[in-house]
């Protein structure tokens, strides 16, 4: 959640996807839309700020994600790839754009009506993979290379985040394919043949970079928790006078995991 005023100034410090302060807003929007709205989505952060009566909301001229912000600085274009945009606001699978019915529902909420902006006016434009997302400007080139050697004019694709990048990198963008990303957070992405028939709060409905519907299962913690456990094992060993190489320790633990049951003993996150 990165909201900006009309001068392009950031109104509040960047609120990341791990900033789980939007429980009230996420629950209310999920009920209003009959569509699961996770706490980390941009629209949940915006609505929570409204419910909290935060002063900055009245000044918002534009809000975006980190990927959208960087792209804006490089090209001057206020756009997002559809996969990244689906983590800001629900996407209509047929139009591959924001769900217009839900846009109207949001604007009609009593707490929202007092603001002069309409939601669609402050959201980035949605683009699908392959569309022109602008070119590197002189200002953008200087941000990347202060020496001035990098030339402007390079065409850029619609900006996506790590989820869209992972789908493309693993060739998991076709229907009935999927991938798992294990990093700071961990999540599974499965490309669906058709939309779900009911709301499941365990499943976040997002899209591929080309706009196909994806069911996402997301957990906030992965390697951060793992690092804590590995650190504990190292500390244990060192207390017995054993010097441990962290690379070797990680390697042994990862390889040991391969000996486990294929269903992880029934363990479910």
For each feature predicted by the language model, list its residue ranges.
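Short glycine-rich, Thr/Ser-proximal phosphate-binding strand/loop in the N-terminal lobe
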Residues: 7-16
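Carbohydrate-associated surface elements
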Residues: 19
